[in-house]
């Protein structure tokens, strides 16, 4: 395919990893950060030592702190900022010519809306969008290790273009039109990863972790179906694939955060030790609010939210889950 210019808005570990992938396969890639000092450091060291150390940038990956210039000079725009910054970014940028894609996993903390709803309000309901999700750690993508992703979109033409943009020998992209399901999977799995980390931090073993993953998948699916998502999405890469990866591997910052909480490390200190945004912490209250609105029971997410707000401690949260009334699976 013809090589394009890509604007990657967000220079954390995941945005940087995907920017490296796109640059390696030949696309000129502009990597935007809001921090001029961060941009200067990346330009000087030809890498991102703050978020993805030890992985050099290709020559066609260019750091920038000029948001508008990046968007206006790009053929395609991809957002990779944390969910709490997503609304601010889309309100600052001009309307992209082709459409808008994002790697962000979460919901808007202010409105409790899915990110696709924010984009529809800003650029129109028919504006082409794409959500890229699935089981993928930044370091492995940046190192060109095999990865499979889900790309959900509301526009088949735009989806085809984004598929061509990403697909390569090391990345296989599967297509979906279930924007609701893919977005919910990305948000809820982070909360469940915190739960699994807490369980392991408490020393509860493999049985408890398997139960949390399985019952967590049931919670995620119930919420999605209540909002119009498709069940098969939750059994795919964006659902069970990303859930298992995030809950079981210590590359997951949400899981590591949970491990610290299970070992009785205070929340502020745990966040400090992780050193990057813990999306599950930010999204727990929002997911619980969405569940309440849709009258969906999500006991694991509810207990994690209560723990994060100081209402229960880790052992008490486990006791509350284990003492729930008996029910059919």
Curated annotation (Swiss-Prot):
The keyword Nucleotide-binding applies. InterPro entries: 6-PGluconate_DH-like_C_sf (IPR008927), 6PGD_dom2 (IPR013328), G3P_DH_NAD-dep (IPR006168), G3P_DH_NAD-dep_C (IPR006109), G3P_DH_NAD-dep_N (IPR011128), NAD(P)-bd_dom_sf (IPR036291). GO terms for biological process: carbohydrate metabolic process; glycerol-3-phosphate biosynthetic process; glycerol-3-phosphate catabolic process; glycerophospholipid biosynthetic process. Pathway: Membrane lipid metabolism; glycerophospholipid metabolism. It catalyses: sn-glycerol 3-phosphate + NAD(+) = dihydroxyacetone phosphate + NADH + H(+); sn-glycerol 3-phosphate + NADP(+) = dihydroxyacetone phosphate + NADPH + H(+). Sn-glycerol 3-phosphate binds at residues 105, 134, 136, 189, 242, 252-254. The keyword Chaperone does not apply. Signal peptide: none annotated. It is found in: Cytoplasm. It comes from Legionella pneumophila (strain Lens). Catalyzes the reduction of the glycolytic intermediate dihydroxyacetone phosphate (DHAP) to sn-glycerol 3-phosphate (G3P), the key precursor for phospholipid synthesis. NADPH binds at residues 13-14, 34, 105, 138, 253, 277, 279. One of its GO terms (cellular component) is cytosol. The active site is at residue 189. PANTHER family: GLYCEROL-3-PHOSPHATE DEHYDROGENASE (PTHR11728), GLYCEROL-3-PHOSPHATE DEHYDROGENASE [NAD(+)] 2, CHLOROPLASTIC (PTHR11728:SF1). GO terms for molecular function: glycerol-3-phosphate dehydrogenase [NAD(P)+] activity; NAD binding. Keywords: Cytoplasm, Lipid biosynthesis, Lipid metabolism, NAD, NADP, Nucleotide-binding, Oxidoreductase, Phospholipid biosynthesis, Phospholipid metabolism. Pfam families: NAD_Gly3P_dh_C, NAD_Gly3P_dh_N. Its EC number is 1.1.1.94. This is Glycerol-3-phosphate dehydrogenase [NAD(P)+]. Its main location: cytoplasm. Belongs to the NAD-dependent glycerol-3-phosphate dehydrogenase family.
